Amino acid sequence: MTLEATSEESRLEDDASQTDRSAAPAAQSAALQHALSVLRRLSEAVKRQVLGRDDVIELVIIALVADGHVLLEDFPGSGKTTLAKALGEAIVTSNEDDVDGSLGAIVPFRRIQFTPDLLPSDVTGGSVFDANANHFHFRHGPIFAHVVLADEINRTSPKVQSAMLEAMGEKQVTVDNATYHLDKLFFVIATQNPLDLVGTYPLPTPQLDRFLFKITMQHIERDAELDVLDSYKSRRDPVAADKLQVARTEVLKARETIDQEVVISTAIKTALVDISRNLRADERVLQGNSTRSMVLMLPALQVLATLRGRSFVSAEDIETLLPRVLGHRVELAPGVAELSRVLKDCMREPMEQLARATLR
């Protein structure tokens, strides 16, 4: 074989490799396409009730399907309750779901208004004495729901916050030395008002780390705000809302399908680890992100890839979600104003290496 032939063969191999990296997304399986349809129906159900918040709705649904939780920083009247309620009521439970009767106390949506005088039992529930039967029985608290809105979570005591921490991390609550399990779909949307810090208890780092995303909500666009005023009556119509609902089992099945079928290559994991290590070593960073944050991010990347019509995680998914995942986890040194600049610098080399890798 001549040198010219060898060179030409190498060039063709390089071209083929480059074509493979830039090719159209691999076709999704029938099961993955069904999972995508479940996510789209769920998204559409929420969008009919919450206008002008498409980006926030997408992140919230990603967190739900990825088995994470969301922290919203917002102002009063921004639609957080409507969003959480719409999501909870879009998920329905049939009698077939409740084979063992364990879902009897689970409701679609609960709102917990956190105050300084709130007790852990006000959240988790507690033992109540039944005089007729002469024994105690457990009264389920508002935390037993598919979707829980923890409103102004930073206004309650650390003791109540720790009760929430157990529920969010372990999907269970402990009352009087007895453990009660929450639903597999248990999902928390917590809020805090960044403008009013009087009488608050800042969330400790371990609890902040339990939230997959921290989302800062802004005022919606002018046209969307007009749509809200024009359609507020129709959006309250329960008949219209019933047409767009998703079964609880469908959401859980979609979660399982996405976990099994969306590929996360070694190159993606390597990039995440290298970015994290760059952040921890950067002199502008006082505290980097934990390994757990990367573990929590993996299923979120899979869900986003599914929403984008792919069966594998790409560099684009990392660029989209990483700022959302790290925004509340990375502590900058005094005088460093922008995390985005630090993150961009720390991502540059790992993402350049990722661009040369095969992802599926």
Residues of each region from the PLM?
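C-terminal engagement/docking regions of AAA+ P-loop ATPases
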Residues: 3-5, 12, 21-26, 81-85, ...
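Pre-Walker A (pre-P-loop) alpha-helix and adjacent loop at the N terminus of AAA/AAA+ ATPase modules
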Residues: 32-75
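Conserved alpha-helical scaffold flanking the Walker A/P-loop in AAA+ ATPase domains
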Residues: 59-62, 129-149
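Walker A/P-loop
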Residues: 64-115
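Conserved beta-strand position immediately N-terminal to the Walker
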Residues: 70, 148, 186
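Canonical AAA+ ATPase core
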Residues: 95, 130-133, 155-163, 168-246, ...
